Design a protein with these regions (language model features):
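Short, glycine/charged-enriched secondary-structure capping and boundary segments
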Residues: 40, 64-67, 91-92
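Conserved residues at beta->alpha junctions
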Residues: 54-55, 99
Length: 114
């Protein structure tokens, strides 16, 4: 899926708001832990979307894709790189972020469908 810069900026803005509200899980290890814990507690993982940077390593890409496939979680690879995604989250570089809130999930899906 490709984005023009305007859509990408809006998407990164929504992701930044998620982080500010404490509804974003940042980094591959934290995402994997969240998916595992949520699955153990509820038996299913709902209203979670994982956003992966375009320049993640092959190993990271495989790891996050395998986890998302196992738990049935949607994953989207965006045009922004690790540095840009990290900047939107107030960090240096981030390979992936998960949105785990129903409202923000809907907002991110809306930006992805533009």
């Amino acid at each position: 899926m490709e984005f023009n810069m305007y859509d990408e900026k809006k998407l990164l803005g929504v992701i930044g708001l998620c982080r500010g509200a404490g509804k974003a899980i940042v980094g591959v290890p934290m995402i994997c832990e969240h998916l595992r814990n949520t699955h153990e507690k509820r038996g299913e993982v709902k209203d979670v979307i994982v956003i992966e940077a375009s320049d993640t390593s092959e190993n990271t890409h495989k790891k996050i894709n395998d986890k998302c496939a196992y738990y049935g979680v949607e994953i989207v690879r965006i045009a922004a790189g690790c540095e840009e995604l990290g900047h939107a989250l107030g960090k240096s570089a981030v390979a992936a972020v998960a949105i785990a809130d129903k409202g923000f999930f809907a907002a991110v899906k809306k930006q992805l469908s533009c």
